[in-house]
């Protein structure tokens, strides 16, 4: 997908966060596609709120995510967010979220990314709080979730 976007907009840069099991495979693919100068492997960081300020569009074409906190955080920072339709609709709290099927041709994903050029960013923290994504509510949600997981392990 990034290769298609980059061919339309050569000044684009892809920031990849995390160090999961696909890290090496993705690095190899980036080299194979000759995109090393345009892809940055950021690893893991506890500075994501600062990182969101360097991003123009948050894209998560994921097969399986559960409730991705990163998608909620990206909205709070005012970013437009494009998510795979496999991701729970609970994440789409603000009007700056677009869901796309993974089966869609990458051309549709690229078109949607480009549609967000010139997007006016502003903090959406209040919208998220009204939707139940206050820090305390989210902490309580995850606490209950992990307590249930632990209970099921017994």
Regions found by a protein language model. Give the residues of each.
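Short hydrophobic beta-strand element within catalytic cores of glycosyltransferases
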Residues: 80-84
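An anion/phosphate-binding loop that grips the pyrophosphate of nucleotide cofactors and donors
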Residues: 55
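A charged, aromatic-enriched C-terminal amphipathic alpha-helix characteristic of glycosyltransferases
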Residues: 120-154
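Aromatic "clamp/platform" in nucleotide-sugar-dependent glycosyltransferases that forms part
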Residues: 44, 63
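A conserved nucleotide-sugar
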Residues: 1-41, 154
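Short glycine/serine-rich donor-binding loops of glycosyltransferases
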Residues: 68-73
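A short hydrophobic beta-strand element within the catalytic core of glycosyltransferases
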Residues: 58-59
């Amino acid at each position: 997908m990034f290769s298609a976007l980059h061919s339309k907009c050569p000044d684009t840069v892809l920031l990849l966060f995390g160090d999961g099991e696909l890290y090496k495979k993705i690095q190899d693919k980036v080299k194979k596609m000759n995109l090393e100068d345009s892809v940055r492997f950021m690893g893991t960081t506890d500075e994501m709120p600062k990182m969101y300020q360097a991003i123009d569009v948050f894209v998560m074409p994921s097969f399986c995510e559960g409730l991705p906190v990163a998608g909620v955080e990206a909205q709070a920072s005012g970013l437009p967010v494009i998510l795979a339709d496999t991701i729970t609709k609970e994440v789409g709290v603000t009007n700056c979220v677009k869901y796309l099927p993974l089966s869609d041709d990458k051309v549709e994903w690229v078109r949607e990314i480009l549609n967000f050029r010139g997007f006016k960013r502003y903090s959406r923290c209040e919208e998220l709080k009204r939707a139940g994504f206050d820090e305390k509510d989210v902490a309580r949600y995850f606490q209950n979730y992990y307590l249930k997981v632990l209970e099921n392990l017994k």
